Regions:
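Residues on the lipid-exposed face of transmembrane beta-strands in outer-membrane beta-barrel proteins
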Residues: 111-115, 125, 151-155, 208-214, ...
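Flexible loop and strand-edge segments within Gram-negative outer membrane beta-barrel domains
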Residues: 132-144, 165-223, 227-243
Length: 504
């Protein structure tokens, strides 16, 4: 090792020692000759090689580890369920008998007899009798009797049912509306020329009906219900009436709505003997017959939409009335209801209107003590706006309260015909009558055997031409009860109360 090398090593050692003694952060300059030596590097020869991207398939197997879960068995106590077993089809009886008895020796009897259940056809017979021996004090004999019999037959086809009905009804009433004093009874006994209908009246009604109704399962088809009813009606005095009524109800489902159309053709021919007196109550020499003929044609289109909670129906009534003179009538119709709390409360409101036929048959069925030939005039229910609330207080108690205001043009009112033989018959007059009505109905089901019901109607009337709403009650009250013994023996009791009516 030469002197230069030794000197360099010494300087390096001194420099390192000085740095250790004095710390870092100072600069030193070393002068000398530095000869770096580079060692020869041994490099590996690596070149890129292509790798096949298609990997070989390796079989994969899944093994389930057998593990047994320990689930202890536990039995819970269950409450016994109460099942109501209902037969698939309710048992039908071929016969049904109804009997009753009321005040003034008033027996009632009804008989129903039919074929019971059949897939092909159905037929039945109905007979009814109701009469009274009378007994009202200080007036004339008040006996009456109502008798009726009707039979029906219906044939079931694939998509329709076709049926017919024959009817006969006979009613007898007594004109008892006079004071039965000794002088009046003596006058009646000594009068020779007394007409047969002076103290009594008979009404005979012979009719038949036919019906064709569709039974489509597809609601998109036009469902139809067409009916024809004809009545030949007459009384003891010789008045006669023939009425033919054709009706058709059409409906079709369309995009969630129900489109409907009602058709009415009502033809009426009425003939009676002309008589003298204020209302035609005095029989005299033959004055000939007086005829009243007319045809009523009506259309009632409607559209109905029903949801889970609501029901809405909007429509109209259009009529052409050709009785005496031809007139056109239009009435709006609408109804809406909404269910609250799962049908516990259902508020509803609506408006109605229609043209009504007042026939000899309809008037004398409402008041059989009319004169021999009452005058006929059709009525118009201009409007009937109503609203109410129905629902259930509980599973046993149901109710319905309602308020309405209506007006009827040419409403029939019944007044006394003063010039009759005994002054005991009634005549009909027509007037515009407005009605404000409040009504309430309640029903109570004690159990499956006993049920009670009651209804009250309070009405306030307003007339145009007549001073009073003759023979219209200011209130009506009805209460009743029903007792059913296994649907084999049913006993009913009902009482009706009417407010004092003004007699004209």
């Amino acid at each position: 090792m030469n002197a230069m090398t030794i000197r360099a090593l010494l300087l390096t050692a001194v420099s390192i020692g000085a740095m250790a003694a004095h710390g870092q952060g100072e600069e030193y300059v070393i002068q000398g000759v530095f000869n770096p030596t580079l060692a020869d590097a041994q490099k590996k020869d690596l070149r890129p090689l292509p790798i096949d991207t298609i990997l070989p398939e390796r079989p994969v197997s899944f093994d389930v580890i057998p593990v047994k879960a320990s689930i202890p068995a536990k039995v819970d106590s269950l409450t016994a369920a109460r099942l109501n077993v209902v037969q698939p089809q309710q048992k039908l009886y071929k016969g049904f008998v109804k009997a009753g008895f009321g005040l003034y020796t008033t027996p009632l009897g009804e008989l129903y007899f039919d074929q019971a259940r059949s897939r092909d056809n159905a037929w039945g017979l109905h007979v009814k009798h109701m009469s009274s021996a009378g007994g009202i004090k200080d007036v004339g004999p008040s006996r009456y009797s109502f008798n009726s019999v009707d039979g029906y037959y219906t044939q079931f086809l694939r998509n329709h049912e076709v049926g017919g009905r024959l009817m006969y009804d006979r009613r007898r009433v007594s004109h008892y509306g006079y004071d039965a004093t000794d002088s009046v009874e003596a006058l009646i006994a000594n009068t020779v020329d007394v007409s047969e209908d002076a103290r009594k009246q008979y009404y005979n009604d012979i009719g038949f009906a036919a019906r064709v109704r569709s039974l489509y399962k597809d609601s998109t088809l036009i469902a139809h219900d067409v009916g024809l009813e004809v009545h030949a009606y007459s009384n003891l005095s010789g008045s006669k009436e023939t009425n033919m009524r054709l009706t058709a109800d059409l409906s079709k489902a369309e995009q969630g709505d129900r489109l409907g159309l009602g058709v009415l053709i009502d033809n009426n021919a009425y003939r009676g003997e002309m008589r003298n007196g204020l209302f035609g109550e005095v029989r005299s020499a033959s004055l000939g017959d007086q005829r009243t003929n007319g045809t009523l044609i009506g259309l009632t289109p409607s559209i109905t939409r029903q949801g889970d909670r609501y029901f809405v129906r909007i429509g109209a009534c259009l009529y052409i009335d050709a009785q005496g003179k031809t007139s056109f009538h239009f009435f709006p119709r609408a109804f809406a209801s909404y269910s609250l709390f799962d049908d516990i409360l259902v508020p509803y409101l609506g408006i109605e209107g229609e043209r009504r036929r007042n026939s000899f048959r309809s008037l004398t069925r409402e008041n059989p003590w009319l004169i021999a030939r009452p005058a006929l005039q059709n009525s118009s229910q201009l409007y009937d706006v109503y609203g109410g609330l129905r629902g259930n207080f509980s599973s046993r108690v149901g109710f319905d309260v309602r308020a309405s205001i209506s007006a009827t043009e040419d409403k029939p009112l019944y007044v006394s015909a003063p010039n009759g033989f005994f002054g005991d018959q009634m005549a009909v007059v027509y007037d515009r009558v407005g009605v404000f009505n409040l009504s309430g109905e309640i029903s109570y089901r004690m159990d499956e055997v006993v049920r009670f019901h009651g209804r009250i109607d309070i009405s306030q009337y307003d007339t145009d031409g007549e001073p009073e709403p003759w023979n219209l009650p200011p209130y009506q009250l009805a209460i009743g009860a029903t007792y059913s013994l296994q649907n084999k023996l049913i006993a009913s009791l009902e009482a009706q109360f009417l407010g004092a009516r003004k007699a004209g």
